[in-house]
Structure formats: structure tokens, C-alpha cells
Amino acid sequence: MVQPIELKLDLPMKLSNAVVSTTAKVWNILVASKRGDLEAVKRSSDECHELLYAQYNYTPPIHFAVREGHYDLVKYLLEQGAHDPKYKIYPFQESLQTIANDRGYNDIESLLNQYAANSSLQKYKGDNGEIHYNRSELQLEFEHAVDKNGYNKVEAILKEYPEFAKDETYFWGEGILLFAAKGNNQKMMELLLSYGAKVPSVLKWAQFYYFERYESAAYLMEKGMNPNVMSWQHVTLLHDMAQKGETQKAELLLKYGADINPVDEEYQSTPLGMAARWGQTEMVEYLISKGADTKKSGAPWSTPLAWARKKGHGQIEKILLKHFK
């Protein structure tokens, strides 16, 4: 798990019930949950109960407790009502029961099902985690001008404050190029790049902004965007493209040197594993043709072949067996 830039800063963060904590404290409880450190989680709860349901990028502590198989911590969080049964992991939109089932955590899956059936236990719901960046009026004006394509205003501000272009915390920590990239506004991107703006290497929403349009993605790759951009869960853009079956964009990433076999934390899978899990037959064939490792994974249950079998993708299973090495 990579600590995002905004969680390295001690910024005010709004939790459930309008309680305000800090990004540092939210990061600490998420890390403790990933480690299965029940006592650390309890200490956070003693300080602020809402931290038990604190979210960064829609992700609360129980997400990590379930994913990493920490039964006692999951049980504690459920006893505290710190789970919304409607929760779906971001961006893959799967339930925690699915995450537990994939890993063979049947006891945890059972706990989640029992909790979901008893609404009286559920104390929290929905999203939280709004971060307050404490920007000056001029910084807000700059961000707004970039968002609304106010080229002349942006240029004028950058002439006086060139350092604004290099601040990666703009637009919720996604970088100042975010909306120019989404709209394929190459004139604005060129201006920002000329003052030192870069696409951050750790992003939450890269596939929905920087790689939404092929033309914009190709432009940024040519300008030096890191082909191994990833989320804080080590999900790279190539993982995202593989999961969605976006072969043209996957080809673009590989052209600029993207690692073809990285393993993410969320599914313990390579891009090939993602493609196999989600039934992307064409992508499976493409990645294999480019030399993807057909065996590599982070766990025995997450190999490409294991995913194809578990999810019932018979054609992909045949392809993998044919190329097994």
C-alpha cells in the first residue's frame, strides 16, 4: 500500500456525523487494519469512534481487515457497526463477501452475511472522507481557472507563481493536469507542462481522467507520463485496461515501457490475471502475445488460470492451458 500525497499531510478530513479528524489519523487506522493490529484500531476508536468507518477514496478500515483475512478485527469492526452492507470496493464494485470468497475466507464471509441480515447492528452508511486543503484565494482561483479552461488567467497566474503547476495536491490529489487531460485540452496541458506540471505516479482515478480519451493519453505518454502509474493499492493503469478489455490503451502503455507483469494488492493479480478474471478473452490473447507470464500472481488463488476456472471462463482457460509455461 502506497501512502498518497494527501495522506502524508496532516490535513483536516471530514468523517461521518460531521466529525473532523485528520488525514494522518485516517492513514494510521487504514494501515493498522491492513496489518490486523486490533489494539491500534481500538486506540483510534477510543480517540474518535468515527475513525472506524473513516474512508480514503471510498475505502474504510474493514476493507483491509477482510481482504487480509483478519477475522478478529473484522468481528470487532462489525460489532462496532462500522460497515455499510451496501459497500462496494472502488473501482471494481464488488462486495466484501466476494473479496472474502475469492480468498477462501469462508468464516469472514459468514460474518459479513450475518451482519448484513441484521440492520440493527449497522451504525454507519454511505461515503465520507472529504479533505480540506487549506488553499489561499489565489490558489483556488488558479484551480478554478484550469477547470474552466481560463487559459489567459492560468497563464497570468503561472507567470507570477510558477510553483503552482508543480503542486500535485490540486484536484483532490490527482494533479493540476486532471481536467485538461479528461477533456483532451492539449493547449492547456502544454501550458501547464511548460511550467513543470507532471502526472503524479500514484493516482486514484487515472483511468477515468488521464486515460479516458486515447488521444489525451497518447499525448501525455509522449510528454513523459509514467507508464507504470498506479493506485495506492498497486493497481496499475495496465491492470485497469486489462480488466476493461481496452486493448488499444494497453498497447499504448506497453509501447512506452509499462511493466507487463506487476502484481496488485487488491486482487494479487497481474494484468493478465485481471483480464482472465473478468472474461476479457481478446485481452488475454493480446497480453500473452506480448510475453505476459501465464503463471505469475501474488497468491495461489489468483493465478490467471485460477481466475478463469473460478469465474467460469472456459475459453480463457483453454487459451491459458495452451500457452502454459
For the regions a protein language model found, what residue spans apply to each?
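Ankyrin-repeat and related helical/solenoid repeat scaffolds used for protein-protein interactions
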Residues: H63-P91, N261-K310
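Conserved ankyrin/ankyrin-like repeat signature
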Residues: A40, D72-L73, D107-I108, K153, ...
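Intrinsically disordered, low-complexity regulatory segments in ankyrin-centric signaling systems
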Residues: V2-E47, R67, E79, S110-Y161, ...
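Ankyrin repeat domain, specifically the short helix-to-loop turn at the C-terminus of the second helix
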Residues: R43-E50, Y76-H83, N113-A117, L158-F164, ...
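Ankyrin-repeat boundary/"N-cap" motif
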Residues: T23-I29, A54-P61, Y87-S95, R135-F142, ...
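Leucine-rich solenoid repeat scaffolds
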Residues: F92-A116, T294-K325
